[in-house]
Amino acid sequence: MTLNYSGDPRAAAAEAADLERAGIDVGWVAELYSFDAVSILGYLAAKTETMELGSSILPIYSRTPTLTAMTAAGLDAVSEGRFILGIGASGPQVIEGWHGVPYDRPIGRQRELIDICRKVWRREVVTHDGPSYHLPLPADQGTGLGKPLKLINHPKRADIPVYIASLGPKNVEVTAEIANGWIPVFFHPDKADSVWGDPIAAGLAKRDASLPPMEVVAGGALSICDEATAARIRDLGRFMTALYVGGMGA
């Protein structure tokens, strides 16, 4: 169940508690150019007891990899091991327009970020030298005083699940290779295999055997109503399409 991210967080928390009592097993919070998802997820962790809580999604450009790892570990701790880190590249309209940073190397950045996060959760002394991220920062790019560090706290879990929101063939292939789960959008079950079957198969062929089977979280809309209301409810789907095409697309 995707929880309301554009309204009152307290109302969303009350709704989440009601949904939990009704049997919903996972609640997702989005982050666009809205309230940040982390504050809401932390509040939800205090107001729920059993349902999993996931970010859907935290953009990879809005936080450093280590901050993303720290945030996920903190949310997993306060929720007693119920957090799912959902990440994604978002799009240039939001990343460059709202966050003011270049939208470059989205798939490569995503892979590096996950690698760094998993090092942090294992409490390794974190070093990384990639195309996008360098830990510690090289001396010629800063003061030269940076040192390799490890997380002070002991995480609730060293294997916090990471889900990726992806659509393009290469991104879906990487998702199937390295992520715990996949968050597609506008998912049509009858057409999924013809669109994504090959990249999923290619990614799974390279998947580390230590990873669990990839979960798929495909959103959908459900409304219980009479026929008179059905047409109006169907029209509400136009809003989400317009948001993705006009408000976030490029």
Language model regions located:
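Active-site-adjacent structural elements that line small-molecule/cofactor binding pockets in enzymes
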Residues: M1-A250
